[in-house]
């Protein structure tokens, strides 16, 4: 925690000339610092922070008593209770420690499409959520999903390390080939050793999208899925005879875009989103529809708070 003062002082260096594409002003950063990513269960951490841990010892929050046993630390004895009951009791505390915040960014080829660009939107959302975690003195682990793997960046701690997160995000480019999101999610889950909030930012354009949800739910983390779609995907401005090409495989299909076709598309899209939300709810995953037109402030301070992904 000794670095906090330096971290806060250095925030003024987050200027457009130095950081692209994720730039936050002082006011936005201060608002982010008042938030915390929610975890509903006690977790094991490796270093003291402000999260609740299942470890017992002398710390900030008293939780219970138990009978003294030979070898217990005598400093934990409650002598006031002994004076009243003439029995030796050990005071139990819950230590508050850090957790690891896992932020997964889908960088498949389809994420580079849309206006605004879905990948750019995802980077900004990832940076904001990373800062929330860093401001809580949690460890933040960033990973990019491409191909069949999850490429992890070194985990960081402390608000001063937001610069490293921004640099990592700025260096991420969209894949030029096909991405198997379910396989990449499974790859990340297999490497995961510390539980905590886990956020996936993705358009979920994958034939096995439901498996992606299942793979991440299996980590027993507090999983949130930010389903990121562009306006053109939600309401395509198409008309006439067209050839629609898959951005990842290059496969194409000829269509005639008329009112009937577009209505059918919107209906199928709504059914797909509803199905993903249903599967997510069943697996205790927070499903958050996230159009790229949604302002970042509204996403973080309204939508994610409403869905209990973050709290003040």
Model-derived regions: residue spans:
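An amphipathic, basic-hydrophobic helix/alpha-beta surface used to engage anionic
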Residues: 2-156, 187, 197-202, 207-208, ...
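Short, electropositive alpha-helical surface patch
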Residues: 155-168, 259, 304-307
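Von Willebrand factor
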Residues: 161-196, 208, 229-230
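C-terminal functional segments of enzyme domains
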Residues: 185-193, 197-201, 208, 226, ...
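A short, acidic, amphipathic alpha-helical segment used as a generic capping/interface helix at domain edges
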Residues: 211-212, 271-278
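SAM-dependent methyltransferase
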Residues: 235-271
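Conserved, well-ordered alpha-helix/loop/beta-strand core segments that scaffold catalytic motifs
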Residues: 275-308
């Amino acid at each position: 925690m000794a670095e906090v003062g330096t971290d806060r002082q250095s925030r003024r260096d987050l200027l457009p000339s130095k950081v692209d594409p994720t730039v936050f002003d002082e006011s936005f950063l201060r608002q982010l610092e008042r938030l915390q990513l929610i975890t509903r269960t006690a977790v094991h951490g490796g270093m003291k922070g402000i999260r609740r841990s299942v470890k017992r010892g002398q710390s900030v929050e008293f939780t219970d008593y138990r009978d003294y046993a030979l070898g217990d630390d005598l400093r934990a004895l409650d002598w006031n209770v002994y004076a009243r009951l003439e029995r030796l009791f050990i005071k139990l505390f819950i230590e508050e420690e850090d957790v690891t915040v896992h932020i997964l960014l889908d960088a498949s080829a389809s994420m580079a499409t849309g206006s605004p660009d879905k990948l750019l939107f995802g980077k900004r959302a990832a940076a904001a959520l990373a800062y929330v975690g860093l401001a809580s003195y949690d460890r933040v682990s960033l990973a990019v999903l491409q191909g069949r793997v999850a490429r992890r960046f070194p985990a960081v701690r402390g608000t001063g390390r937001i610069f490293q997160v921004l640099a990592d995000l700025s260096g991420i480019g969209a894949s030029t080939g096909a991405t198997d999101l379910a396989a990449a999610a499974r790859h990340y889950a297999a490497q995961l050793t510390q539980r905590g909030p886990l956020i996936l930012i993705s358009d979920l354009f994958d034939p096995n999208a439901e498996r992606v949800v299942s793979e991440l739910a299996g980590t027993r983390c507090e999983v949130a899925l930010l389903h990121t779609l562009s306006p053109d995907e939600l309401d395509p401005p198409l008309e006439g005879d067209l050839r629609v090409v898959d951005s990842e495989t290059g496969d194409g299909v000829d269509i005639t875009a008329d009112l009937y076709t577009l209505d059918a598309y919107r209906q199928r899209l709504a059914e797909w989103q509803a199905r993903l939300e249903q599967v997510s709810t069943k697996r205790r995953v927070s499903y958050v529809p996230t159009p790229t037109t949604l302002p970042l402030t509204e996403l973080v301070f309204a939508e994610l708070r409403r869905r209990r992904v973050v709290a003040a």
